[in-house]
Amino acid sequence: MKEGSFVELSEYKHLIEEMQSAVDDFRGSLDLDALNESIQENEARMAEPGFWDDQAAAQKVIDENNVLKGKYDTFKQLADEVGDLAVAYELLSEEPDAEMQAEFETDFQHAEHDLQQYRLNLLLDGPYDRNNAILEIHPGAGGTESQDWGAMLLRMYTRWAASHNFKVETVDYQAGDEAGIKSVTLLISGHNAYGYLRSEKGVHRLVRISPFDAAGRRHTSFASVDVMPELDDTVDVDIRPEDLKIDVYRASGAGGQHVNKTSSAVRITHVPTGIVVASQAQRSQLQNRQTALNMLRAKLYEREEEKKAKERAAIQGEQMDIGWGSQIRSYVFHPYTMVKDHRTNYESHHGQAVMDGDLDPFMDAYLQWKLAQRNPQ
């Protein structure tokens, strides 16, 4: 083998070390011993004589064990794959061989792909990450400026969803006074929609030269984004009819156009918490009522989960004011262009691409950040 080829091969050493480091991180976050212990406990239960007496409970144990075994086996396979690569590299370093290197490079590409896929599966392992997402945008104080910023975010998320072939349904839409929106609620349907979009929850800050300011001054606007998983009926949320205040009104679409001429839109207020949800996307009042109730269930569930998380001191700063110092991400278009996430420090100088829906790098960085929090070094 020529010296130039060996230099090329030597570059793999650092890449393989990075792979091994990633595998070690995964091992730490998985806790293989506890995982294996849970598998053995389940298998012991499955071997008991009366295991099938309660078929529903038995199936639940089997399903849970399949998930655990899948996690364990997939990790072991990945660790072996990366280990084999390291051995192959050492052999090639000692005895260069063109045919063996070609095979090594193919194996490396496969391992790289498997590692990325495993990382994604590990990051999106929350109980509702695979669910559809309910996404709300609420502009902050600032009138037309903030309402226009809300509309820009609406376009950004719609473009992002389209790039993933996700379905977007506008559940509720309140148009701005002169431009933009006062609020909007979207149902974004697709595999892992909530898992990705939960990274977007928080306050988003815009700095730009205002198109609404004749003097061409720089303005700062804020909008909050809330994201919840769409829940099915198996998730138990206690909603008492006497706690609900239900109003009906005439639905109106973007631009103020009436969707229909009957009072089919429904707004529900949960009196004990003050949570308000609304739906005007469906054709009938009954359908809108059900959609609104589903959103209320999601919000109440989210509220309870946040309460538990705060009690465990696992979440900080979830309740934020729409204002200075509380934003998760800044979008600066003057005097320079940069979009920066303040949690992960990931940034992009391609502001227009981000506004066109190029959010995956930000979402990936957030998921990696969350994993690092679970597995501190």
Swiss-Prot record:
Keyword tags: Cytoplasm, Methylation, Protein biosynthesis
InterPro entries per UniProt: PCRF, Pep_chain_release_fac_I, Pep_chain_release_fac_I_sf, PrfB
Pfam families linked: PCRF (PF03462), RF-1 (PF00472)
Modified sites of kind N5-methylglutamine: Q257
Molecular-function GO terms, alphabetical: translation release factor activity, codon specific
One example of a Gene Ontology biological process annotation: viral translational frameshifting
Keyword Cytoplasm assigned: yes
The record's account of how the chain is modified after translation: Methylated by PrmC. Methylation increases the termination efficiency of RF2.
A GO cellular-component term linked to this record: cytoplasm
Miscellaneous comment text of the record: The gene for this protein contains a UGA in-frame termination codon after Leu-30; a naturally occurring frameshift enables complete translation of RF-2. This provides a mechanism for the protein to regulate its own production.
UniProt similarity note: Belongs to the prokaryotic/mitochondrial release factor family.
PANTHER family for the chain: CLASS I PEPTIDE CHAIN RELEASE FACTOR (PTHR43116:SF3), PEPTIDE CHAIN RELEASE FACTOR 2 (PTHR43116)
Role summary: Peptide chain release factor 2 directs the termination of translation in response to the peptide chain termination codons UGA and UAA.
HAMAP family assigned: Rel_fac_2 (MF_00094)
Designated name of the protein: Peptide chain release factor 2
